[in-house]
């Protein structure tokens, strides 16, 4: 789905099953974890399609995976115009926090789909991209995706980490994108 891949969930899952075969554990003390590309935000169709195909005739519970990823960014003004990281009013402040709370809905709904295929929760939800994402700061290189963080971002992080903790039976790993992807 992402970065121009333009794949259907079924096609991707078949490709995933094919190529994961060649990713093997070579050291018993350092097992490789296979993470399947999951949904962007509320694309429940993707989650259902990938799991349905990946788990079809799969050995026992795992659908050839240890985790399924999920991406969600909080951008208060929308994807095209994300809003300023430092110049915002109270309305945008509350809108940002409200959108942070949406992470719980995403985890619950994607988790419910995962439960259909993996009721024992052996496949982890891997929220490998999350956080706030605003319009690049004026005067900075847009390719570097620099944004100044504020107390508002700390509250988004606190809300989100609390949600992850609450759903730790399914969420097994999370990566704040600003730490990993230089936002």
Tell where the protein language model's regions lie, with residue ranges.
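Hydrophobic or amphipathic alpha-helical targeting/insertion segments
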Residues: 1-3
């Amino acid at each position: 789905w992402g970065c121009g891949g333009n794949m259907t969930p079924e096609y991707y899952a078949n490709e995933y099953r094919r190529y994961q075969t060649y990713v093997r554990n070579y050291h018993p003390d350092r097992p490789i974890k296979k993470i399947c590309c999951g949904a962007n935000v509320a694309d429940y169709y993707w989650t259902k399609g990938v799991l349905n195909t990946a788990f079809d005739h799969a050995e026992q519970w795992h659908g050839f995976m240890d985790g399924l990823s999920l991406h969600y960014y909080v951008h208060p003004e929308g994807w095209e115009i994300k809003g300023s990281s430092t110049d915002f009013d109270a309305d945008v402040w509350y809108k940002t926090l409200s959108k942070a709370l949406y992470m719980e809905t995403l985890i619950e709904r994607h988790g419910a789909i995962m439960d259909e295929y993996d009721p024992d929760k052996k496949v982890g939800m891997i929220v490998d991209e999350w956080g706030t994402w605003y319009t690049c700061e004026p005067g900075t290189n847009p390719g570097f995706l620099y944004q100044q963080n504020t107390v508002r971002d700390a509250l988004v992080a606190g809300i989100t980490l609390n949600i992850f903790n609450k759903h730790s039976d399914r969420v097994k790993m999370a990566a704040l994108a600003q730490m990993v992807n230089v936002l």
